[in-house]
Amino acid sequence: MKGGTMAHIQLIYGDEPQLIEEEKRKFLSAYPDLPVTVLDDEAGPQKISEKLCEDSLFGDQKVFCLVNLPIIRKSGKNSDAWVPLYELIMEYNGNNPILLIYHDMIDKRIKQNKAILDKIPNHQCKRLEGADLVMWIRQYCTSNGFKMTPDAQEYVAHLIDLWQDVPVSFMRTEFDRYFLQITGDKVITKEFLEENGSDYG
């Protein structure tokens, strides 16, 4: 873009709400002093465009969190009403950081979607499976000051295999509960998991 740098815009998308929530917190933590304005598709393209432009004029800085807007297209569903907002965001050079959140995967075959992904820094949060989910759990334990024994990790991997498609949010809730139950050594063992685990599904 000529003159001025592109404002800080990021797109977070995917089918794993827990990871989207984590990425959202990360983005917002960079702007602790700014109020957050959340707008979704119900606000309508015109109102959102007005908000983005009016704030550029009046200079009250804030973070815009724009959720599930049809500027990201699905095949067979096109809404021309959103095109001006799409163009505004693609060329946006105001001062307000914008976080775009889209709770689904994005069809990259659609030209407009591909253009968004090419232009705007983005982070995909897709369902974690198998080893990736075990890795997430290990990191989550570590960040809370807990360790898992190797046989506990194997046990968790086995459960994840068995359950198929278990969301991160379920595992997070489970482990939050374990953290509260364990006193003394912050170690999660296979025996503990066998005695205290919930059954998914």
Q: Would you name each region that the model predicts?
A:
Residues 2-201:
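Non-catalytic interfacial helical region
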